Amino acid sequence: MEKITQYGGFTLVKGETAIYSVGGEYDGDFDALLDAAHKAVEHGNTVYLLPNPRNCRTADFIFRKKGAYMMYDLKTVYGKGSVGTQLLNSIGQSNRILLNITSDYNGRLLAADIKAYFEANRNAVEVLLFKGKKTISVNRYAAQSPMFYRQFRKKYEQ
């Protein structure tokens, strides 16, 4: 991933200090991508927006933090509809998912959706959530814990 970010086509997005792109600022998803990227920068990441080629399932971002590079597919949660469907549809795009929660989504349902995602996708590594100024990272190990629902809801609902 480091080599991808060093590709000469990445330039700073106009008006930003830690968000890079290879173009596509006028893509229909750009505002949602930029919103999530701003939150990632607030949490200490440098963000690289990846191109979105037609007919090809790819991740949306590479985050760099303290020398580590991670690739994420963005799913923005606008309403109270099923996050589970969005998570399952992301299988094959990236092994890390970023859920940008912009609505009041039930913590119990969200925990169940995340657990089901890890069960359905053996390659899944992490589901990262942004909810307001809060960030919650859930890995496979945590989702398999018998205490997962209680621990997740405590973090999510506080």
Residue spans for each PLM region:
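Conserved catalytic cores of phosphodiester-cleaving nucleases, focusing on short active-site segments
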Residues: F61-F63, A68-T76
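Metal-dependent nuclease catalytic core centered on acidic motifs
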Residues: M1-Y48, V77-Q158
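Short acidic/glycine-enriched loop/turn segments that link adjacent beta-strands
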Residues: R54-R57
